[in-house]
Amino acid sequence: MSRRGTAKGKTAKYDPIYRNRLVNMLVNRILKHGKKALAYKILYGAVKKIQQNTKTNPLSILRQAIRGVTPDIAVKARRKSGSTRQVPIEIGSTQGKTLAIRWLLGASRKRPGQNMAFKLSSELVDAAKGRGGAIRKKEETIKMAEANRAFAHFR
């Protein structure tokens, strides 16, 4: 039996301008090669574009987009008797938000467009309206979980 203690969960820090944890989580996922200033520049540019295009509060659009993409259930690969099965599992709110942010950024990176700020802003607006690549990814995951419902007892 392990004598090592369990790690304490870390809370996400707040963003310096908007004082929002979601914004900080997004910045940390945009971050590549330690260039945090560039990540902030991309996100703030996207927020400014959302403000200009929709004439509404960009943080509410951001929250709405993440809430729309956040899954309740996901599939996890489990090996059982020589074959790998996709087992549906329920996921918590923090893990769901993390997945949603990852899917939003992945979908925005695949989009055609000028720069990342433009692509991210259009993906966030689309996700808030219930369409876009990230919403498609969520629906795919839900379909996979429904199809593999028979393996739910393998948890």
From Swiss-Prot:
Main location: plastid
Highest taxon above the source species: Eukaryota
Molecular function GO labels: rRNA binding; structural constituent of ribosome
Gene3D superfamilies registered for this protein in UniProt: Ribosomal protein S7 domain
GO cellular component, one term: small ribosomal subunit
Cross-referenced InterPro entries: Ribosomal_uS7 (IPR000235), Ribosomal_uS7_bac/org-type (IPR005717), Ribosomal_uS7_CS (IPR020606), Ribosomal_uS7_dom (IPR023798), Ribosomal_uS7_dom_sf (IPR036823)
Location(s), subcellular: Plastid, Chloroplast
UniProt entry keywords in alphabetical sequence: Chloroplast, Plastid, Ribonucleoprotein, Ribosomal protein, RNA-binding, rRNA-binding
GO process annotations (BP): translation
A Pfam family hit: Ribosomal_S7
Ribosomal protein is among the record's keywords: yes
Oligomeric form and interacting partners: Part of the 30S ribosomal subunit.
Function field: One of the primary rRNA binding proteins, it binds directly to 16S rRNA where it nucleates assembly of the head domain of the 30S subunit.
Family of this protein: Belongs to the universal ribosomal protein uS7 family.
Record-given protein name: Small ribosomal subunit protein uS7c
Organism the protein comes from: Sagittaria latifolia (Broadleaf arrowhead)
Upper taxonomic lineage: Eukaryota, Viridiplantae, Streptophyta, Embryophyta, Tracheophyta
